[in-house]
Regions:
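Conserved class I S-adenosyl-L-methionine
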Residues: 43-53
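Conserved SAM-binding loop of SAM-dependent methyltransferases across substrates and taxa
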Residues: 54-66
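S-adenosyl-L-methionine
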Residues: 74-111
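Short beta-strand element of Class I
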Residues: 68-72
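Class I SAM-dependent methyltransferase Rossmann-like catalytic core
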Residues: 1-42
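A generic local structural motif
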Residues: 32-36, 58, 101
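Charge-rich alpha-helical segments
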Residues: 40, 50, 89-91
């Protein structure tokens, strides 16, 4: 990686906050902002996070959906396992014909 990029990343306030708060990426703060402003994810919701790696937004969605909610983190890149019990990881290309069946299987056939 470019040394300049690494240096800028270390100085980035959201990168530091993500590290301090245990989020996997600074992108978590984008969803946190949207969630605070619009409340798009409610307790018990099912969330499909496309292009989820490394998983910062999935973490936020997990907390917003709560224990009765469920998050599927989908990416063709590897995603480290989550400690949150309501997140399932699918390593798959979103364009794969298998994705619809895999998602339906994880949600018990409910959309």
């Amino acid at each position: 990686m470019n040394p300049r990029w690494k240096s800028e990343r270390r100085r980035d306030i959201y990168h530091r906050l993500a590290t301090e708060k245990g989020y996997r990426s600074r992108a978590a703060f984008k969803l946190l902002h949207i969630q605070r402003k619009y409340g798009i994810i409610r307790a018990g919701d099912r969330v499909l996070d496309l292009g989820a790696a490394p998983g910062g937004m999935a973490q936020v969605a997990s907390h917003a959906a709560g224990r009765k909610g469920f998050v599927i983190a989908l990416d063709k890149a590897a995603i480290k396992p989550f400690t949150e019990k309501n997140i399932a990881v699918l390593r798959e290309d979103v364009l794969s014909p298998r994705v619809e069946r895999l998602v339906l299987d994880l949600t018990g056939g409910n959309k």
